[in-house]
Amino acid sequence: MRKSGILLHIASLPNKYGIGTMGREAYNFVDWLRSAGQSLWQILPLSQTSFGDSPYQSFSIYAGNPYFISLETLEEEGLLKHNEYADINWCKDPRYIDYATMYENFYKVMRLAFGRFSKAMNGNVSEEYKAFVAENPWLENYTLFMALKDAHGGKSWCEWETLLRLRDVTAVYSAKKKYAKDMEFYAFLQFEFFRQWYKLKKYANDNGIQIIGDIPIYCALDSADVWCEPQLFQLDRDRVPTVVAGFPPDAFSEDGQLWGNPIYDWDRMKQENYRWWVGRMSFAKKLYDIVRIDHFIGFNSYYAILFGSKTAHGGEWHDGPKYDLFNVIKRETGKGGIIAEDLGIITPSVRKLLKQAAYPGMKVLQFAFDPTGKSEYLPQNYTSQNCVVYTSTHDSDTALGWFNNLDRTTKQFVKEYLGVRHAAELPEAFIDIAWKSTADMAMTTMQELCGFGTEARINVPSTIGNNWRWRTLDSDFTAKSAAYLDRLTEISNRKPPVKKSRKKR
């Protein structure tokens, strides 16, 4: 069945309190998607972000981002008073997230909510909370990790005292006793996060909207995952990485990309029958309806750079687990529900892996306009319907911003191919050819629908600061744009069967 939808991260939803949340505006967006005839909502990783604010660098592969908890919902639950959060100036410009202000104020407000939550329990743990803790065994390690980070002034676990860094049994036991209340606070945050998330997901599903989630291939070094299971990563005896992940120099980057993530010990993971990955994918498939796996080609082969290197020069390619991993994942978690982000160097070996896995790959229109007309990303050259076409992604400029930075020859080719005369017509033309392509799924962004330029870009890869900040406003979700998309979706044979609308929370 042909489908289509919008890529819009939770953080980018409108909201008075600094960042998009799983509150009223998220439900309004589901309603807007339904009115626009859409069946897919794609988001970025829901993970708790670390100091760079990137959802692809998280303190845990399991923990949700507490910033997405709706403060208004907590007020409805009796855990907050309105003035306790409404009187705070969360941001200067509603178009952009101010992460410094969020960090300064959010956890203070949540401590107030936690205090009331703890008192309301009166020593008797609610059945819902008890069930949540029992169903999520990762919570204990994660909450201890966060409590210890607080105790160490936010420092990476790599800088903690030796006994805790190496997870000495006695030291860990003592820390759990000492920081029990702080661990409870972080467990409370996760309880509220997932409580709100699954209610929102159910509402979306009840209204015919599937959620496409996203998981990074690698963990951050400063994460509970690496701290707790160092044997699964290429670390030395002192838990220092021997090699880190990245990408070699190419036409787009003279020094390559130095991501800095520790690399998996794939031999050890295979010995454990990929237990860690099966657990991760099982969790992701519960969290989302469809899972996009970032940097899929890294499972075929990965680029390893010596730890401490300043650039990506001098790294080496090594074989990844290839289909062996995905064969186990399919057997243990089911066959479907995965999108492979297969952008990059597509070798015959990568093509073989994609064919074996049978996951849909990605086609990004901004890569399509080689003046020869032979690009595999150009819709006329698609050889399979088993793919997802994107007008742009979180790592690219908007269609308009991209076009404005092209050379004159390529601009002319784009105009001729799309049949447009002016740059302002480009975003709609991109959406049109994506929707009318043979790809099973077609995705665009709110930036494209609104015709925004580079000012609305979410992320510039390999740069630090000023990323992941852009947000929508209520005024962006117009009846006119919904009607346009609804009609295009209908004539493109992507419109889902009509379902009776479900009520909000």
Residue ranges with predicted function:
Residues M1-A11, Y27:
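N-terminal regions that are enriched for targeting/export leaders
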Residues Y186, Q190-C219:
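Conserved, well-ordered alpha-helix/loop/beta-strand core segments that scaffold catalytic motifs
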Residues H9, N15, D53-Q190, F194, ...:
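Alpha-amylase-like alpha-glycosidases and glucanotransferases acting on alpha-linked glucans and related
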Residues R24-T49, K286-Y288, A434-K436:
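Catalytic domains of carbohydrate-active enzymes, especially glycoside hydrolases
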Residues L44, Q210-I212, P216, I290, ...:
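Outer-envelope exported proteins of Gram-negative bacteria
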Residues A483-K495:
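C-terminal accessory segments of extracellular proteins
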